[in-house]
C-alpha cells in the first residue's frame, strides 16, 4: 500500500490499483479514466495518491515497470522481444520503455533479462 491514508482513501486507492492492474496494457491509461472508474474526480484521485506518497502518474509508470520486469523474468521470456514486452505493458515506444526501465532499475530491460536468466540457471 502507499503511505498513510484513511480507510476510506485506502478503499479508493485499492479500487484504483485494481483498475490499473487490469488495464495496464492500455498506453492511454490516464488519471481521468482511473478516477471515473473509481467514481471520484481526477483532482480527488490525484490528492489521495499524493497524500499517500506518490503521484498517480508515477504509480501507473511504476506498475508498468514492475509488470514488465516480471515478464522479462519468466521462463517464456525469450519467446517475446523486449520491445513487445514494453508494448504489452503500455509503453508507447521501445526507447521510452528502455529509458524508464534503466532509470528505475539501473539496467536496461535486456540486461535484466540476461541477469534473470543467469540467476535461473544458477538456482
Locate each region found by the language model.
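A short, structure-level motif marking secondary-structure boundaries and short turns
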Residues: 1-3, 15-17, 66-68, 83-84
Amino acid at each position: 500500500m502507499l503511505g498513510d491514508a484513511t480507510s476510506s482513501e485506502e478503499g479508493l486507492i485499492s479500487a484504483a490499483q485494481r483498475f490499473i492492474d487490469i488495464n495496464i496494457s492500455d498506453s492511454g491509461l490516464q488519471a481521468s479514466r482511473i478516477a471515473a472508474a473509481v467514481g471520484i474526480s481526477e483532482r480527488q484521485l490525484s490528492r489521495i495518491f499524493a497524500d499517500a506518497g506518490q503521484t498517480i502518474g508515477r504509480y501507473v509508470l511504476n506498475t508498468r515497470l514492475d509488470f514488465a520486469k516480471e515478464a522479462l523474468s519468466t521462463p517464456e521470456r525469450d519467446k517475446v522481444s523486449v520491445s513487445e514486452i514494453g508494448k504489452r505493458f503500455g509503453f508507447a515506444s521501445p526507447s521510452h520503455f528502455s529509458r524508464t526501465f534503466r532509470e528505475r532499475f539501473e539496467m536496461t530491460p535486456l540486461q535484466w533479462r540476461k541477469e534473470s536468466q543467469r540467476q535461473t540457471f544458477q538456482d
